Amino acid sequence: FTTTDLDGKPVKLSDYRGKVVVLDFWATWCGPCLASMPHTNEVAAHYKDEGVVVLGSCTNDTRAAFEKWVKANREKYPDFVFTHDAAEKSPASVSLKLYGVNGIPQQFVIDREGKIAALVNGYLKGEVLLEGALAKAGIKVDPKIVAQAEIDQKKRDATK
């Protein structure tokens, strides 16, 4: 897929083949999306030497809102590559058309071969589901953190 960065340049998922990509679908109006960003950035910074990159793809939002938000906040999130889906709120959006996203935040962890290794739906402060997802993509994650991610997921599953 292709989205565009703040400067309007195309950003392709295929450009990151060989890396583990956290494809993070978010919007400027989504409170849980914004709440998840500090943790996602910390995780990206911690694992970037292992080839982890975060593509923060703004979806269901206007280009103007995206540009305003990124200009005001990008320094807080140096380990994000922020992009915008030109289809904005249409059914042709990358998030809906290619990934079936019907709620945000959603993070797809894509392995080095370009295959989806794991999915994290939503965000609750203190959870380590993203780290567990990275482990499924072949990233070396502390076994204690992986065990905690499994506990976090079981707690979520129990409340469904």
Q: Predicted segment positions?
A:
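Short, internal strand/loop/helix patches
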Residues: 70-113
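Active-site acidic short loop of glycosyltransferases
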Residues: 16-19, 49, 77, 101
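Thiol-based oxidoreductase modules, predominantly thioredoxin-like and allied folds used
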Residues: 49-65, 77-90
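Thiol-/selenol-based redox modules, centered on thioredoxin-like
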Residues: 106-160
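Alpha/beta-hydrolase fold active-site loops
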Residues: 20-21, 52, 105
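Conserved redox-active cysteine motifs that mediate thiol-disulfide chemistry
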Residues: 17, 25-45
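N-terminal "domain-start" segment that seeds a small globular fold
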Residues: 1-14, 79-84, 89, 129
